[in-house]
Amino acid sequence: MFKIIKCNQINNKLINKKIEINGWVKKIRNHGKVTFINIRDRYDEAQILVSDEKLLKITSQIKMEYCIKIQGKLNLRPLELVNREMKTGELEIIAENIDIISKCNELPFMIENNNNASDNSKLEYRYLDLRREEQKQKIILRSKVIHIIRNHLTKQDFLELETPTFVKSTPEGARDFLVPSRIHKGHFYALPQSPQIYKQLAMIAGLDKYFQIARCYRDEDSRGDRQPEFTQLDLEMSFIKKENIFKLIENLIFTIFKNSLNITLPKKFKKITYKDAMNIYGSDKPDTRYELLIQDMSKALKQSPFDVFKDTLQNKGTIKALIIKNQAHNFSRSKINSLEEHAKLYKARTLYFTKIENNEFTGGIAKFINPIKKTLIETYSLKNNDIIFFIADLWETACKAIGQIRIKIATELNLINKNIFEFLWIYDFPLFEYDEDTQSYKAAHHMFSMPQAKYINTLESNPSKVLGEVYDIVLNGTELGSGSIRVHTKELQQRIFNIVGFNDKIAEERFDFFLKALEYGAPIHGGIAIGIDRLLMLMTNSNSIKDVILFPKNSFAASPLDKSPSKISDEQLKELNLTIENK
């Protein structure tokens, strides 16, 4: 009898024992009277030695990635043939039986080295790409992380609840994916962009601790880090404050990293307000792995004779600056021009600069800076070979543009430590933002977030000044998740709907069922949703969330694997009472 085992179960205790393993041919080497086969399964790989003449005839038919069954006796390898790069490198199986379970066509790319394969090819043959150790381990880690999440939250009395997948269309910013109803002709379901309303209904039901590994769907324009369907950890709690969410998530993420990567994170994460994040880092999702802090030079440059600075300050703008210490020699004119063009992509009028050489400001706008050089040098401890970049504009534009320059410079100067994980909470977000195109307010996060108490009575008088009980969690410059304390009264929810342009009639049409529920004793509640795909992308240092999704779509929201989306038959269209108009 042969004992069926996996490759990782091969060990010295099985020497001289008869064993059977099944897997895929990773490598095959024919040495005439002896053939060596490396077989791979999910767990590891093993070497097979074939010397029997009858079996050699079979191995002559075997090619890479054939699925095979091997039966044989486990032996120690000769010392000189030990492979230290393999976990099972001291052992090999002397083949007694070989069965070809199934053959493999000519490969579209090499499994072990598919760097030359196109992204579309790897997606079309994703089942082959997943045989690569690196890709396989990412998917295994995904399973492990989700298991840790479930265990951790269940131990804390959370209920894993499933919210509907077919819901009423209540657009949350992106377009809904719509599903026509055959029974209710002319009516449509939507696939949920998030379980937001339904988890709030669960709180109203008294199910005070909810979580879900939720599938979400958004019909967004193509972008590299987006997928039309994605997975998030969605959770909600009743009778809490935001600090309860912070503590819960910090403990959860600490457990995830410790139990999956054996990395010990700080027990508490840094916290910073939205305004400070914008002022110091130029981003509401800052990367804090490197310093390179933004300076507000509005006061210091007030006496500069430069008209652009004067006009900006007179028009209630600001002057933001980046000081790059001892690096002026690394910034050629062409590199500075490139940075200027980069700043303009983020609506800045331009990017100004000056360098310090021989205790004088030189280049760029030096002639406008030298009259106040003593003040600047003393205030900012400037030295020779420093270079300063300036953006003068309205506050938000100046912050965002100089923030993007910060990222670009840090990348080009290799200032980013890619071996650390810097988590950060951002809070005190504006509840609303003004859309210049539509001349109206919209929710900065979503319409169900609670205003801070001090703004509730004067909500409508100046919506752009209102701060919300809203928070984001950021990892290495990527927004991982967003949450808030929720509105729990119908009256306040209707006021917020009105501010974002939903009058009572529209609000009733779209959210009547939710507004009704708010009249039946809703508790104080709040929660968060964390992108599992993004978290895993960062944990594995991947370039895209596609790497950590089992069968992802490409950047055009299409699947090269199954060729979806696809046309449907005229019969199906007729059943759904749909017609296609060609325009």
Swiss-Prot record:
A cellular-component GO term for this protein: cytoplasm
Matches recorded under SUPFAM superfamilies: Class II aaRS and biotin synthetases, GAD domain-like, Nucleic acid-binding proteins
Site (Important for tRNA non-discrimination): H31
Keyword Cytoplasm appears in the UniProt entry: yes
Binding site for ATP: R218, D219, E220, Q227, E479, G531, I532, D533, R534
Chief localisation class: cytoplasm
Catalyzed chemical reaction(s): tRNA(Asx) + L-aspartate + ATP = L-aspartyl-tRNA(Asx) + AMP + diphosphate
Coiled coil stretches, renumbered: none
Entry-linked Pfam families: GAD, tRNA-synt_2, tRNA_anti-codon
Binding-site positions, L-aspartate: E172, R218, H445, R486
Annotated segments matching region Aspartate: 196-199
Record-listed E.C. numbers: 6.1.1.23
Enzyme class: ligase
UniProt keyword annotations, A-Z: Aminoacyl-tRNA synthetase, ATP-binding, Cytoplasm, Ligase, Nucleotide-binding, Protein biosynthesis
GO molecular function, one term: aspartate-tRNA(Asn) ligase activity
Keyword field contains Cell division: no
Cellular compartments annotated: Cytoplasm
BP GO terms, sorted: aspartyl-tRNA aminoacylation
Gene3D superfamilies: Bira Bifunctional Protein, Domain 2 (3.30.930.10), GAD-like domain (3.30.1360.30), Nucleic acid-binding proteins (2.40.50.140)
Subunit structure, as described in the record: Homodimer.
Function summary: Aspartyl-tRNA synthetase with relaxed tRNA specificity since it is able to aspartylate not only its cognate tRNA(Asp) but also tRNA(Asn). Reaction proceeds in two steps: L-aspartate is first activated by ATP to form Asp-AMP and then transferred to the acceptor end of tRNA(Asp/Asn).
Entry similarity comment: Belongs to the class-II aminoacyl-tRNA synthetase family. Type 1 subfamily.
Designated name of the protein: Aspartate--tRNA(Asp/Asn) ligase
Highest classification ranks of the organism: Bacteria, Pseudomonadati, Spirochaetota, Spirochaetia, Spirochaetales
